[in-house]
Amino acid sequence: MAINGNSIPAIKDNTIGPWKLGETLGLGSTGKVQLARNGSTGQEAAVKVISKAVFNTGNVSGTSIVGSTTPDALPYGIEREIIIMKLLNHPNVLRLYDVWETNTDLYLVLEYAEKGELFNLLVERGPLPEHEAIRFFRQIIIGVSYCHALGIVHRDLKPENLLLDHKYNIKIADFGMAALETEGKLLETSCGSPHYAAPEIVSGIPYQGFASDVWSCGVILFALLTGRLPFDEEDGNIRTLLLKVQKGEFEMPSDDEISREAQDLIRKILTVDPERRIKTRDILKHPLLQKYPSIRDSKSIRGLPREDTYLTPLSESNSSIDATILQNLVILWHGRDPEGIKEKLREPGANAEKTLYALLYRFKCDTQKELIKQQQVKKRQSISSVSVSPSKKVSTTPQRRRNRESLISVTSSRKKPISFNKFTASSASSSNLTTPGSSKRLSKNFSSKKKLSTIVNQSSPTPASRNKRASVINVEKNQKRASIFSTTKKNKRSSRSIKRMSLIPSMKRESVTTKLMSTYAKLAEDDDWEYIEKETKRTSSNFATLIDEIFEYEKYEQIRKEKEELERKVREAKAREELERRRRKQEEKERARKLLEKEDLKRKQEELKKQIEIDISDLEQELSKHKEEKLDGNIRSISAPMENEEKNINHLEVDIDNILRRRNFSLQTRPVSRLDPGIMFSSPTEEVSPVEPKRTENERLTTEKKILETIRRSKFLGSSFNIDKELKLSKMEYPSIIAPQRLSEERVVSDSNDGYESLILPKDGNGVSQLKDSTATTAPVSDGRLRKISEIRVPQFTRKSRHFSESNKRLSVLSMYSTKESFTNLVDILKNGNLDVNNQQSQRIPTPRSADDSEFLFETVNEEAEYTGNSSNDERLYDVGDSTIKDKSALKLNFADRFNGSNEAKQTDNLHLPILPPLNGDNELRKQNSQEGDQAHPKIKSMIPESGSSSHTEKEEENEEKEEKKPEQHKQEEDQEKREKVVDDMEPPLNKSVQKIREKNAGSQAKDHSKDHLKEHKQDKNTAIGNGSFFRKFSKSSDKTMELYAKISAKQLFNGLEKLLRGWTQYGLKNIKSHPNNLTLTGKLSSDNIFSLRSTLFEVNIYPRGKMSVVQFKKVSGSFKAVKKLVNEVENVLNKEGVLQK
């Protein structure tokens, strides 16, 4: 029995909790190490007994921690040892089972290592074979690397602190001098044995703890291979020894003694400069260790944490701080602000908070994994226990389980935790209880006096090694811990029992580990010694709470979950109440709003009603006043009849009809001619009824239909003008009148042309003929006026054709359908009566400008006069039949009409000029008899060039040459050409028209090679491009480039242009991409640019030209006009900068 200095027995029957103390394994300056055995499971352990008097005197060496000058540091070195050893969980690190205390001593229950110290093995055997020495050395390095990854430095590595278990595996022990490598500070404590100490330690300068442990491992490797130390003095002169260590002077063994790989590794480890010294992870990769591989050690290496775990512990938890671990750190730092700890965890560099967080997090994960494994083992054993023989005396009955107070089951596995259950003192002493995880050495003779270590270490107590390591599981939650061994329950004063350190004075707390006293001096001055005699207790409740929460995780986790669930329910209830309150408030607002709207609507209705009444009264007054004025006016001439307002209205309608009739007849009183395809005339045998004075409603609708058709033909509204819609609107004005008959597709010629005899012109005949003037007078029309075609007034929106002289000033849609050969001065015909056809043909006016250029539809008269010569609107206006094409579908004057309607056509013997699509939806024209026209008349040359001719190709080549030579001359025409595209799937033209010859500069001649070029050009296309059309043709312009020459280098110009174009992104440039390798820039001019240009993709290439450079602008797609504008802007900038070569 151990007796303390005050002669107060602290241990009853030589037991400490469930552990019965046995023989002493070693003695040290701070205490001794005793062998212990669990009374219930038979598990062996080494108990390190430390006197509390050491803490009061402050003689514990190595108690200084890095950063201990800060208020956040842990107060005692022994606390550091408890926390670190409890949290470390590695096969090559000695395990701490539990901690107990009395009023005089502190008991650390450690893992028991049967084979003792490595030092004893070296003394007995001497130098070890290289493969065996490397096996020990590798396990040492793995354990040290594990500690370093968690920011822990041992600082006292030597063979005396390296223990061996029953399988001769290394167990690193004695963390009494361990320190946290934190806050980036250097350790300043000179500790460790001088033979194994690093040069920076013996020199007394601040040192890096990681490097010093590596030096100690190098000395141990030297001793394992040679059986001696590299730094030693036979005479024991410490001063000479320290000088050798400072200089790193030692004698390297020869090749006969150790291998070259071993020499290389020792040389790299025993390097004086700690910065150049090899690291632990690099040692594991050294050829010497790779020379002797081990499967078990390889698994341990793979399970090592990251080297910088202590620097970035949050990376393992997804950068979110665990609330449980944070609360533990708050307790560990004695109620420190959690926000301050969070800032420490997130700031760069190493600190104590990060190290302990990493340790706590790994311990929590390992505990959860082991708990799951143990539960699975229990399930399997519960199933297998059914088949156990009744003769086996295993106390597993429920009655005996209810009587237990503290049964500890230590598993044989080093990682399986200890199980704590309740049991009574009598049952503990009488029952032979075993659990599934109990040790296999239950039959070991505990009374044996066999010593496991004959070497006494005077510097520090060396605990014996454990057989198996165990970790902690939770205690039953609804039971309170009582005295473990008690002789009687009535006499508590004489019991002298030992309480667990986790107990608080209320005896409602329980723990599976211990906490040392926070203020031992206060206990020494306490007068209530009876209380101290009666029981030992924990005095640092904060630290006790920390230990309980860490190592009884499941119990406190359940409490936390219940608390969180309660808080969640409270929050949900509050949220529901708040939601209900908001809903009621919203409903009240909605009701108030509806009430206000209802009142406002009622008020507005009343105001509107009053206003209507006022307006009605005003109108009545005005009406009465108007009647009075009318009566006053009639008084002057009583005999005169009163004016009939209805009659005036009828007169007005008649005048409107006359105007419409005049316009309609102006289109039909012209002589029979092929100039105007809009005029349809019947055969000579048809008789036309005269116009009645009063037109019916159907005739009025017919007239409106013809007017709308003429407007559409004028190309002013085009296909966008919906004629049927307009007719429907006109019919709505007269809903009672319904047209009884369908309008005729052919137009009826009025009797104003009765003086002439209508001629049926052949299909290919010229649009001129000698007129017969038998009467020389025209018939009167219904309104009594004479009608002539010269009296027609055509609106100015139509274009002016330059094929006619200034004298007649013919501004009519007819000119768009005319040809040079078919031109006839109709005014002269009407005035002179006859006109010689041959003379007329000989007097045709040549085309002053090419009809191959484009022209917009909606231009003013002046603009048309300026650009009509180059306009492409003089192209094919209508097609004349060809002998090779007979059954073509009707011509569709509108571009969109070509793709609509049926292709059926009626056969007729008479030739009718082309007409627009009729209003009844039939979009085809009558087919024409081509054979008769081919024999009677030659083909008429059209004003539109044929798309397949070689002359057309010449025009395109000439236009491209003009664009290159004079880019600013035809700027508008180029922009239009860029916008035009070819519709490949258009229907073929009805008739092939003769090419229109362009004469420029007094007779330029067509080139022969252009025809060859045309043939090659045709082969590259799938469909014909030049389909005859009333509209302009769309063609895709070829890619063209423009170049500028600069005086600077290509690279400098490339950088300048890249910055310039990127600076213009706010003005419409987008997607500027640079390719420095080939000096190319690409980009896009968006449609919303400041110049209102089309969206265009362009490419800029820069080529070196000696010391100068050439920049080439290329249009990828879009408008070449936009590219030209961009080139002009870039040219202006380069000219201002003075880098443009002129």
From Swiss-Prot:
The keyword Ubl conjugation does not apply. GO terms for cellular component: cellular bud neck; cytoplasm; Gin4 complex; nucleus. Residues 19-289 form the Protein kinase domain. Residues 441-452 have a biased composition (Basic residues). Residues 454-465 have a biased composition (Polar residues). The modification Phosphothreonine is found at residue 884. Residues 382-395, 425-440 have a biased composition (Low complexity). The active site is at residue 156. The modification Phosphoserine is found at residues 406, 465, 471, 617, 689, 719, 805, 807, 883, 930. One of its GO terms (molecular function) is ATP binding. Its EC number is 2.7.11.1. Residues 923-937, 962-984, 996-1021 have a biased composition (Basic and acidic residues). ATP binds at residues 25-33, 48. Residues 378-412, 425-469, 676-698, 903-1031 are annotated as: Disordered. GO terms for biological process: budding cell bud growth; G2/M transition of mitotic cell cycle; mitotic morphogenesis checkpoint signaling; regulation of protein localization to cell division site; septin ring assembly; septum digestion after cytokinesis. It is an enzyme of class 2 (transferase). Keywords: ATP-binding, Cytoplasm, Kinase, Nucleotide-binding, Phosphoprotein, Serine/threonine-protein kinase, Transferase. It is found in: Cytoplasm; Bud neck. It catalyses: L-seryl-[protein] + ATP = O-phospho-L-seryl-[protein] + ADP + H(+); L-threonyl-[protein] + ATP = O-phospho-L-threonyl-[protein] + ADP + H(+). InterPro entries: Fungal_KA1_dom (IPR031850), KA1_sf_fungal (IPR043024), Kinase-like_dom_sf (IPR011009), Prot_kinase_dom (IPR000719), Protein_kinase_ATP_BS (IPR017441), Ser/Thr_kinase_AS (IPR008271). Component of the GIN4 complex composed of at least BNI5, CDC3, CDC10, CDC11, CDC12, GIN4, NAP1 and SHS1 which forms a ring at the bud neck. Belongs to the protein kinase superfamily. CAMK Ser/Thr protein kinase family. NIM1 subfamily. Serine/threonine-protein kinase which regulates the localization and the function of the septins during mitosis. Phosphorylates SHS1. Present with 736 molecules/cell in log phase SD medium. This is Serine/threonine-protein kinase GIN4. It comes from Saccharomyces cerevisiae (strain ATCC 204508 / S288c).
